[in-house]
């Protein structure tokens, strides 16, 4: 429920009751919708539009890669209200999927994390009240980035879990599988891989803990934790891919089979390097912060 991070505390109690309560209690599913077919990391190029008419906005456009899109009752939607301002023209809205003009489109056939449904969402003259706007016009990108800061810590934790599962499976297999008259774990080629896997896992864990602590401190200080979150997400996601790849290799032929779960860990790990900002975007964020650039 990372989407709850995008809900400003100053919103009315009626809106909180309508949107926050059912999602926070698990009675409803929420979603976060920023990406479009032609707009990923470069959010300022999004083509969806929200045109204001009095106290109502008319929304048209297509959003893609919406996690829980096929089942979500509510969405936090980011769309363009002033295209000339690029990312400073993005505005956020709370969306009720039951209203006319909300269309669930194709479900994505994904490489991994198949238990999580992902789809496109179409908006066809969808009407939303000004009361359901999050923040002011043009504040959407700022809200989206704040949500991503928190979300990247969660993705780091997800990546860590995948890496740990792949590592544990590899250790167990190395203890049991025999080749050339001995356990394969006795071979340095395997043992050294396991050592590297374990070391990276523990380093990733500490970066995630550090980011989580920075997030907690921000509640008192108001400071952003973008740097810590990006470092944790970058390292943990690349660790997940490194460990999952090594796990398949250690298992050999059976690692390529669906008889064992390591092939799933390999498929599931890849998305952690992509969503919530690719590894390249994380490196860009980290380097710009360290260099004092915007």
Q: Where on the chain are the PLM-derived regions?
A:
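Conserved hydrophobic/aromatic beta-strand scaffold that supports enzyme active sites
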Residues: 31, 47-49, 56, 74-78, ...
